[in-house]
Regions:
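Conserved short loop/turn motifs at secondary-structure junctions
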Residues: 98-104, 132-134, 152-158, 188-195
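Short runs of predominantly hydrophobic/aromatic residues within well-ordered alpha helices
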Residues: 81, 109, 146, 164-168
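Short helix-capping/linker segments at secondary-structure and domain boundaries
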Residues: 2, 157-160, 175-182
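Conserved phosphate/anionic-ligand binding catalytic regions in large, soluble enzymes, centered on
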Residues: 151-166, 170-173
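Long, compositionally biased
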Residues: 127-150, 158
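Long, well-ordered, tryptophan-enriched scaffold segments
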Residues: 1-131, 136
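Extended redox/cofactor-interaction regions of prokaryotic respiratory oxidoreductases
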Residues: 64, 169-208
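Composition- and surface-driven signal marking solvent-exposed, interaction-prone regions
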Residues: 128, 161-167, 183-187
Length: 208
């Protein structure tokens, strides 16, 4: 969900590529310290927080004479999302490559991935409700993604469990299923939605 990523994440922020320098791998920032993005409408590097831009999510952009006020070294920059693509689409992480490590058949991995994508994008929820987002932009409908996930102590207590949780929540972001209709499990103990939802089912007197 590229619109979700651009609106609510830093996927479009530019990351400097300048191997051998202290700035390599850091976000590109302007003189005021604000992160920068590449605007496809104007073909310029601008404040990433602007709401009137169409930020590039992929590509590589030269920085010399391009980043206004940027005090870092010359070089090039890519959107953070590009780095994610480069890693996730690497052949080392293909279903066939990881099947043996995970103990899950490659065809089953593909099937589950297809089911997640189908539910999120082919069965999206559309509610005709007007609302205003964090940047003051007004919308005439709410889009929901009927895909929800839950991670708590069971995963985080395992070795490398934090990275497992990170992968789960990155997947939620890629699908645009965070803080939207369909993105919450019914009566989960945590994370709690805002505003709070029904109390979790437990003892008989706690069930509503």
């Amino acid at each position: 969900d590229l619109e979700f990523l651009a609106r609510y994440t830093n996927a479009h922020w530019l990351v400097r590529r300048a191997p051998g320098t202290a700035d390599d791998g850091l976000f590109v920032r302007g003189r005021d310290g604000k992160p920068l993005a590449y605007d496809r409408n104007t073909d310029q590097i601008v404040d990433a927080a602007r709401t009137d831009i169409s930020p590039a999510m992929r590509g590589c952009f030269p920085l010399h004479e391009a980043a206004p006020g940027d005090g870092g070294s010359d070089g090039e920059a890519v959107p953070a999302f590009q780095l994610l693509l480069d890693r996730y689409l690497d052949e080392r992480y293909s279903p066939d490559a990881v099947a043996g490590q995970t103990g899950i058949d490659a065809d089953r991995i593909r099937r589950i991935a297809a089911e997640l994508a189908h539910a999120a994008f082919e069965q999206e929820i559309s509610l005709d409700v007007e609302w205003t987002d964090w940047a003051g932009r007004k919308h005439d409908k709410i889009i929901g993604r009927p895909v929800s996930m839950h991670a708590m102590r069971g995963i985080s207590a395992h070795s490398n469990g934090f990275q497992t949780c990170r992968a789960i929540h990155l997947l939620q972001m890629l699908l645009g299923s965070i803080d939207c209709p369909g993105g919450f499990r019914y009566k989960p103990p945590f994370p709690r939605p805002a505003p709070p939802g029904p109390k979790p089912a437990g003892k008989p007197h706690q069930v509503s």
